[in-house]
Amino acid sequence: MKDFSKVRIAIASPAKIREWSFGEVEKPETINYRTLKPEREGLFDERIFGPIKDYECACGKYKRQRYEGKVCERCGVEVTSSKVRRYRMGHIDLATPAAHIWYVKDTPSKIGTLLDLSAAQLEKVLYFSSFLVTDPRNAQKDGRPLRRGELLSDDEYRELRFGRQETYTLPSGTEAAVRDGEYVTRGQVLGGNVVSKMDGLAQYRFPRRAEIAYAEEAEASLPLPSDVLVQQDSFRPGEILAELEGDVQITAPVDGTAFLLDMGEDSVLVELRDSAAEDAAQGEVLARVYIPHGMNVQVAEGEVVEAGSVLATAAAGDRLRVSRDSRLSNVNFPKKKGDVKVTAHWTRRVEYRIEPQMHVLVGDGSEVRKGQKVVGAIDKEEEVIAEADGVITLHAPASIIVSKARVYAYQDEPLVVNGDRVEPGDELADSGNLRSEISGRVEIDLVRKQVRVIESYDFEAKMGAEAVKELLDDLDLDQLEAELSEQMKDNSRHKRAKARKRLEVVRAFKRSGNHPSWMILETVPVMPPDLRPMVQVDGGRFATSDLNDLYRRLINRNNRLKKLIGQGAPDMIIRNEKRMLQEAVDALIDNGRRGSPVTNPGSDRSLRSLTDLLGGKQGRFRQNLLGKRVDYSGRSVIVVGPQLKLHQCGVPKRMALELFKPFLFKVLEEKGEVTNIKQARKMLERYRDTRDSVWDALEEVIEDKVVLLNRAPTLHRLGIQAFEPVLVEGQSIQLHPLVCEAFNADFDGDQMAIHVPLSAQAQAEARIQMLSAHNLLSPANGEPNVKPSRDIILGIFTLTQLRKDNLGAGSEFANEQDALKALDEGRVALNTPIRVNGVETSPGRLKYVFSSPDEAIMAVDRGEIDYQDHVRIRLNGTVYETSAGRVMFRRLVQEALGAQGHLVDTLVNLDTAYEKDSLKDMVMACYKELGIEATAGLLDALKDSGFKLSTISGITIGIDDIVLPPNKRELLAEADEKLAAIEQNYEFGFMTDEERYKQVVQLWNDTTDEVKNAVFENFSRNYPFNPLWIMSQSGARGNPQQIRQLAGMRGLMARPDGSTIEVPIRASFREGLTVLEYFISTHGARKGGADTALRTADSGYLTRKLVDVAHEVVVRDVDCGTTDYTVMPLGTTDERTGEWRTRKGSEIETAIYGRTLTADVELSDGRVIPAGQMLSLEDVKAITRDAKAIGEVFVRTPLNCRVRAGVCQKCYGYDLSQAKPVSLGEAVGVVAAESIGEPGTQLTMRTFHTGGVAGGGDITMGLPRVIELFEARKPKTQAVVADRDGVVRIEEEEERYLVRIEAEDEAFSSKTPMKISKSLRLIVRDGDHVEAGQPLTRGAINPHDLLLYKDTDAAQRYLVEEVQRVYRSQGVKVHDKHIEVIVRQMLRYVEITDGGDTDLLEGQTVERWEVDQANDALPEGKTPASWKPVLLGITKSSLTTKSWLSAASFQHTTHVLTEASMRGQVDELIGLKENVILGKLIPAGTGLTTVREMQVADERTLEKYGQTSVSTDAVTGSQRYDDTRPSSTSINPSYGD
């Protein structure tokens, strides 16, 4: 026994992983190819994991056990057993944290749930495609504060961290549509068809042209005519100077060369320079004349003019005004009218082309000073120097940069440098007068004297598991719990559901003591090397476990990352390497869970990761923990052993020699045949030379032993039984023919396994509990499973059959003499039924009257009569009309019963021909009346006699034994006539094709039945002793369908889809099939083969699921004390006719046999069966007889039991395999699962097609229906059910019915009608009264609807009845209680509708007892939790179980282990599977604590200890010896010796 009672699973912290480890694995090397020794610091390092050779260090300095525990100073290896390499672990320290993929990819993701991230978001962070904000500080995004835990794309991160700027290239020669330094908005055109994608500051890059607008001014004269009056002293651009009344000319005041200065529009300033100068353009200015807009210039540039020459003209009515690009000031009016002096101001624009090697030194719109360098260049001559003060404008930039920035022009020194980060209000320049308005990064343009602050923020955001770990590290679970509890009060159901999921995870972490950050690995444990071995194969190559490849990949990447970090590699490379490390960790833990799996080089086989080692049929749980290979076992072909007793099996000598070797050694040593084990081993080495003394010793060894025989598949507990071994020659195991049915074995090459229970306790348990003779009744239905069959039935039936002659049948005679005379004359035969003096008899009974059975048997031996002839025999003073064979059979049974032979008449009826069922009833009667020993003896006697009789009867089949009925031809001709009529009606359009098809199928079904009846009538009337007929009638072999096909007609066949082919096979096998008929047959045959294969797999899986859901249900208490009961109706009343219909006897039996009554039942004979009594078969038969008067009985069922994870004896009732109250510790859950699953293969796969009838739908039947019910699935064709009690009101529309249910109280009537399609057939009429949950249409009811609209009881009864309907349709008998045990497990969970003041959350699914426990624990005045029942399918129910070990070994191993470790779940080891996995005794049967604590004592011991009284427990039948001492001793016969 292991000394622990609970097992807890939790997440390992990095510290715990290092604590497990014996050293760090730093290198990916495994073993040296030359020395074949492990490499240091590698995956097989002896310093870390221990020595390869027992008690020997790596260098060989220390050898032998005397140095145990010493660490070699040369090689560093500890001297110890090499077994340590199976459990010593290592570790790998990761260069960067990596997430555990189970907590990432589980649904819902545990890490994602805690951090409120979706699975996709979490994946983006972990695999380096998004940043996770770990510290937002004052960062803003889209005008709101950045949140912690928010995701940022690469671009978003760069924009927020370093500022966003985008460069837009303009096509060559395109003029910009915005100014340099202008703020632009998203969507604004920048130039050509280039549009800005963001708001921000636009800045030119590489302008191709620059234009400087120089501000010019000069004094000039404005000669106007005397009649023009100028009254202002200044004129603005565009202002009117004068309106002319007559023509005007302006003339040159002096001689000179004219130079024209453009002042915009057509206004000019004419400079007259000295013509005598060498270069007139450089000559002295003699005069300047201002010519306003509106005058026509009459002089050309560089023209020499004389004083008085016309410079410009204007016509009368013209307006003179100042040009728009100039203005006039200091207008002086002379005394003499006409010549006005003015100062003219104008802008002179000069354009400069900027080549690529040149660069602008000032910004667009900047003012320039005369002599200032405006454009720099490599070549000094290309530089642009300002000719005068002016303003520069830049044109045609190569590109425009738009950035989120603010530009500040400064005068004084800046107070910041490039790259500095500033916050709002920080000083930038001008002694603190210039301050930043935003957060950002500083860029200083010293040339333009600008400080540019690019909007960005100093915040923390990271990628990968490192970022996630930081958030998990900082999680405040208490605060988060408070926030989520608040969210649970939200009105939104969706928000509450989301909060509940998160709150469950938060509370799980709080209660378990796990820290959320442990879901991120800093250290990876390395499995012990002997669990991931590397072995040398032929050819010098190595075969290695996939894990080594995965570890090697991880170590390589880890080392490479460490190296790159040490070298200061670029961020991009390191990021990629970190992602690859995360993927390597993922592949090690669960290969293929994300992305494509890592495969073997050169093949498509994906490597088996740690997860693959656990899950699936070949995983650790199912392969190694639940199913272990055992020693002391053998396997061989089985052959029949007709000479064996029921409790015996034949074991080949050679096999026994090997199986019992240790015991044999001991006996040989005791006998002095050998002196030591070595000698004994040598003695047994050569089988052929084995001495007789060894065989004698072997006989002695096996004398009091039993062995277990097992045939796969073990579908129920009778698949393993104990037998006493008998040594036989040959190499085959011999099996008793009668146990074949339990094993489902036959002798066509079946093999069986044999096991030896080793300890005395195991031997005792096997002998008492598992001996074949002690398992005569089936646990599924309580009927004998060991019963005569095949040849045995044939022999006994032949013996006890009565011959019937037809010669002179029905003749009447006045007296016996006349009858005997007629016999002598041959008018009647010996066994002809005749009447003598009005009494029915036969000539044989008149002629042969024997005074004793011996006399009759002697007459048979003399050949006077046959065993089957009618005779009269005196027996115990009474004369019986019977046959010699029946008397002979009575004697056989009497001899078999031995000492109890006087009770033979309670078993044998001389009026019966013993066929299959009557023999079964006889075995059952013997079991009940005389017990196990007598029944086993009787069965052996029947076997011996049956085989002998069937042999000497000489019954065999020849082709002539298949007799065709004489009227078959007439029946077929009649059918053809009807067929012609149907076809004619169809041709005339009186019916649809569907109706024709249905009628044709029905016609041939009826005809086939008629032919079958004709076959049977022909056999029974004319050939009563026909071998084929005898075999069929006795139940030995062949059913009516097979006889029909042999001698009648094959009939209709099925298509592969299950529908019927309307062309029948008219021939029988005796006549032979035509080619077409043979072809049609092949359809059905193939479908049968395919169905069987599918059924076997589905049935096995169903059994596995059933065992899983119910394995913990064990009888744990005598009486749970419940007052609940279940009403079992014994019949139904037809609603329309009011007629009572009693249920079939077999149905009543499977419903109430072995149940505890909760109310008295009064029988018509005045007998009362009291409440509290368990119903025996006799009680059930009596109740069935009075079913109509009784109506219904009230019984306890497992559905009402209050015992947690089990049932009590009273609620369960009888153990059907013992026909007595169930024992404490009986694993009734497993028995239930096996009882339902074992016959699963017999169920059909068929979905009955209704031949395409509209609205008929497909009715799922057989195995798929059973699976559908146990999985609580929505049926394919679902019935609409009433949602309340009331009266049905139906309105008909074109395509549907509107159904409303009116309740008695108007307030409860349905407001909106149910819309029912006309394709669903209504089964209620307008005005019918219905109850909630009653179906309104054809189809199967959805059990969830029953639970919703009615109650738990209705759902339970429906599930039980529907499963039974399928089993009964196939003739399989299963007791209701087995189905109830499973249904109870499906309904053990509830959904919380309001948590009240408990810790339970709305929407949570928990076991019912948990809610009761939580509510009971509340102090007074607090609100208890409320709930509603939920129906879970068996798969869901198995996975929801409290036992994580059981759930993980069932399905979805990773999900179960993820959940359990997060919750720090404790397995209380209540069920069977958990204990099998841990190698503990299962808590059932003899392993149950209460049973193990019982002490078995004999009378003498009791007297010695002074016991005073003996009392018998009414329920268990166990005797208790009560005493004043606290440790009373009790005996339970079920487990005693």
From Swiss-Prot:
Class of enzymatic activity (EC top level): transferase
Q: Which GO terms describe its molecular function?
A: DNA binding; DNA-directed RNA polymerase activity; magnesium ion binding; zinc ion binding
Give EC number(s), comma-separated: 2.7.7.6
Q: Where is the composition biased (Polar residues)?
A: 1506-1519, 1526-1537
Any GO BP = DNA-templated transcription
Q: How is the cofactor bound?
A: Binds 1 Mg(2+) ion per subunit. Binds 2 Zn(2+) ions per subunit.
Q: Which cofactor does it need?
A: Mg(2+); Zn(2+)
Keyword Transferase part of the UniProt annotation:
yes
One short Pfam family name for this protein?
RNA_pol_Rpb1_5
- Entry binding sites for Mg(2+): D746, D748, D750
Which residues take part in binding Zn(2+) 1?
C57, C59, C72, C75
Q: Briefly, what is this protein's role?
A: DNA-dependent RNA polymerase catalyzes the transcription of DNA into RNA using the four ribonucleoside triphosphates as substrates.
Q: Name the family the entry cites.
A: Belongs to the RNA polymerase beta' chain family.
UniProt-recorded name of the protein? DNA-directed RNA polymerase subunit beta'
Q: Tell me what gene encodes this.
A: rpoC
